[in-house]
């Protein structure tokens, strides 16, 4: 387990988002990324991230943004070093963003983002 402050964790998330290529980021609309300490009751407590929304192009609500949740405590527990945490935050951001673009877990695994 690695331990970083909530502020440092937010920096790592911001860095992961900044690393998304501009061409891809330009396609993202009505999406927010939120950091929570742990998954909600009813979800696996080792869940690293979660996409909550509709697939891009299939906007059902039109008003409320789709959401990517990153769960700080499970990510910290999963990683032994800050370098591992940097990588895992990036992988989790890309994985959940992939769901926004309609990719399922099997395809994300094939692409190395699972």
Annotate each predicted stretch with a short phrase.
Residues 1-88, 100, 106-109:
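Active-site rim/adjacent substrate-binding subdomains
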Residues 110-114:
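Short hydrophobic/aromatic patches at helix-to-coil boundaries
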Residues 88-96:
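Short alpha-helical catalytic segment bearing the HExxH-like zincin motif
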């Amino acid at each position: 387990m690695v331990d970083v402050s909530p502020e440092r964790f937010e920096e790592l998330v911001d860095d992961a988002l900044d690393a998304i290529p501009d061409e891809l980021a330009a396609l993202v609309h009505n999406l927010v990324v939120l950091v929570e300490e742990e998954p909600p009751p009813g979800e696996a407590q080792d869940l690293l991230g979660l996409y909550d929304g509709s697939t891009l192009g299939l906007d059902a609500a039109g008003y409320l943004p789709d959401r990517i949740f990153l769960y700080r405590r499970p990510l910290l527990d999963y990683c032994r070093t800050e370098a591992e945490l940097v990588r895992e935050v990036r992988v989790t951001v890309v994985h959940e963003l992939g769901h926004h673009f309609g990719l399922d877990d099997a395809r994300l695994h094939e692409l190395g983002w699972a």
